[in-house]
From Swiss-Prot:
Purpose of the protein: Probable aspartic protease. May be involved in the regulation of exocytosis. Acts as a linker between the 19S proteasome and polyubiquitinated proteins via UBA domain interactions with ubiquitin for their subsequent degradation. Required for S-phase checkpoint control.
Gene behind this protein: DDI1
SMART domains named among the record's database cross-references: UBA (SM00165)
The protein's name in its UniProt record: DNA damage-inducible protein 1
Key words of the record: Aspartyl protease, Cytoplasm, Hydrolase, Protease, Protein transport, Transport
Amino acid sequence: MNITVTYEHSDDVLGPFELSEDMSLIDLFALIDFKEESQIIFHNMKQLDTKNTNITLKEAGLQNHDMLLIKPKNPASSQAAFGQPQEIDLTDEQYIEQFRTFLLENPSMAQEMGLPNLEHMINNKTQFHQLLGPVLLSRRGERSNNPFGIPNSEYSRLMSNPDDPVNQARISELTNQHEIDEQLRYAMEYTPESFTQVSMLYIKLEINGHPVKAFVDSGAQQTIMSTKLAERTGLTSLIDKRFSGIAQGVGTGKILGRIHTTQIKIHDVFLPCSFTVLDTPMEMLLGLDMLRRHQASIDLKNNVLRISDVETPFLPESEIPKDSLHALTTPAADEVRKAALKRDSSSGKNAMTGDANKVKQPKIPSSTTNQTVPSFAESDIKKLVDLGFSRKEAINALNKTGGNVDYAASLLFQ
């Protein structure tokens, strides 16, 4: 038969134990460490007779899948052993004496405490109260029997004058923290996966016949290639250094320039792609510009990336480059993801306002600067300024594109 044992004072559950119905009660008590002098055992809501322990489980009325409940004989003293005595209506002297009485009744617990001369102090009431009393009272004050889990002294002070502004602020703080703790317990019980690390999205592709594991990041504006990958794939000669500058995020990184177009191979499909070449440990990042251009679809249900009618699976965690995982936690990763391009004073300004801009951008009439500047949202202007352009350039671009930030950014990068 299968028997399960539960303890009332700790909610611990033992079993189920697979036992023979011919097993004696005394053997069962030894198995579950039942102490008759301090505990009571119940079966089917009735106290089990422990006077005759030589009878079998079958003779005692136990059946398959039954549960036994073990309760302490003296709830107050038992809970005191676990640091949670019944201290309601107990004075400090009564509380200390209750603890001493429990240790007298449970010498094994006294031995586990490991205090020198404890046995002598237990038998000397005055010495026990003088030496251990302050320690027990300190623990009693730190323990809480209130919904906020704070010391009872603080809880009593707050509840004695709840209309006081200071107390109200503290109660509000405790209430909010209690709700947060409840949410945490709920999340850990029902959505434990939210506390685990999620694998990033990588796919396999080829550039000039070289296999590459590319990080797919729809949160990055631009597609990035590292300088080492550009060298390995023989694309260094195609870097337009007029687009060099500084990538600024948490830290800074050097932008060597831009590769305007090259082909990448995903399965049997060749796709044109442009890259910003950045000095970063991450080899390659597929940003939103390339994903939008080829109308890519990130299918998390099937764990694939659909692009140009081709499905390519995302790599399992075991195949993700370890150095790239480290790169995602460094400041350089933030530079790559945000792609907040800021030109330095020496080369960046020439890169963005050089010959390429003179050819592709129409010249702004000089009278424009004297006209009243249309009012655009400060957040839109800031987005363009964060890309490395001056406030004046940002406003002019917004003026030309009717306030569309995306079009304005494209215009400025031409």
